[in-house]
């Protein structure tokens, strides 16, 4: 049967290998447990008295060690006896003690059932249908949840505008969540006024200010509509119906009019503005109208050059 020896008054620099070398010439050492200035040496010999006699007065680093048989304060003899610690009986051990109330609680199949008190003496637990809390308040405030922690502000200047929109979204979420819970509570109590504001009133929602030079972002929904041409109202002018009405000086026989079949665009002569009639051409047109008898229109101010 293995035994254990107590070794006291050890120096501070003693390790398990050095202590094991002291006992190996006299016995077979299995383990050494050093605790500050004392240790426990486990050996395989049953008779430890000769070993204690030989090592009495042994000196390690100038200190005389104290060696004796290790015993427990509760058990004078080493080893675990076959005695019940509950009823002090030698016929059985503690797990099989009949005085243990948990050993008598068995089911029909002979399986032992263990019961644990999880309340720790705090009292009787409330049931799910406990009417202490009002049902309306339970509905209104039962849906509250912990808002996730806020993300720290990044140091990158390109992310500042997006981070401000993130903070604004968090503020809006908390505001509308509290408003919804208050409305639900008001509806449960039968209140007609409520806590919500009417649609015509304005609610000051916090708006994040963009830093200088950054792009302003918006979290509000924007409705997009296809681009449609503007509607022009009809005009009751005498010349609105005529589609081939031209100015009196817009002649197709002008020397500067380009042909329709030209493969390239017309080139305006250098020094002369485009779509401008000369004075000679304008006088020829007036004479032609007087000869044919057509009424002469009010001429536009000529551009002379």
UniProtKB/Swiss-Prot annotation:
Coiled coil: none annotated. Residues 296-305 have a biased composition (Pro residues). PROSITE patterns: RRM (PS50102). One of its GO terms (molecular function) is zinc ion binding. It comes from the Eukaryota. Residues 3-72 form the RRM domain. This is RNA-binding protein rnp-1.
């Amino acid at each position: 049967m293995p035994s254990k020896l107590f070794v006291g008054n050890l120096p501070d620099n003693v390790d398990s290998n050095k202590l094991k070398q002291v006992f190996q010439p006299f016995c077979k050492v299995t383990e050494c447990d050093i605790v500050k200035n004392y240790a426990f040496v486990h050996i395989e010999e049953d008779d430890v008295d000769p070993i204690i006699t030989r090592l009495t007065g042994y000196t390690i680093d100038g200190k005389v060690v104290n060696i004796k048989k290790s015993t427990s304060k509760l058990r004078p003899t080493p080893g675990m006896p076959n005695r019940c610690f509950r009823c002090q009986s030698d016929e059985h051990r503690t797990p099989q003690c009949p005085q243990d109330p948990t050993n008598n609680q068995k089911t029909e199949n002979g399986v032992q059932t263990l019961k644990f008190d999880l309340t720790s003496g705090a009292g009787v637990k409330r049931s799910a249908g406990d009417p202490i809390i009002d049902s309306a308040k339970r509905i209104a405030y039962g849906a509250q949840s912990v808002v996730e922690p806020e993300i720290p502000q990044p140091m990158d200047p390109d992310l500042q505008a997006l981070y401000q929109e993130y903070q604004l979204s968090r503020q809006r979420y908390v505001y509308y969540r509290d408003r919804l819970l208050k409305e639900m509570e008001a509806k449960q109590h039968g209140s007609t006024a409520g806590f919500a504001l009417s649609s015509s009133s304005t609610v000051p929602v916090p708006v994040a200010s963009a830093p200088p030079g950054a792009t302003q972002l918006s979290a509000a929904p924007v409705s997009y509509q296809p681009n449609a041409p503007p509607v022009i109202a009809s005009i009751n002018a005498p010349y609105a119906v005529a589609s081939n009405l031209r100015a009196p000086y817009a002649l197709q026989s002008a020397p500067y009019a380009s042909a329709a079949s030209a493969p390239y665009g017309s080139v305006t002569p250098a020094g002369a503005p485009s779509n401008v009639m000369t004075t000679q051409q304008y006088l020829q047109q007036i004479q032609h109208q007087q000869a044919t008898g057509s009424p002469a229109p009010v001429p536009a101010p000529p551009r002379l050059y």
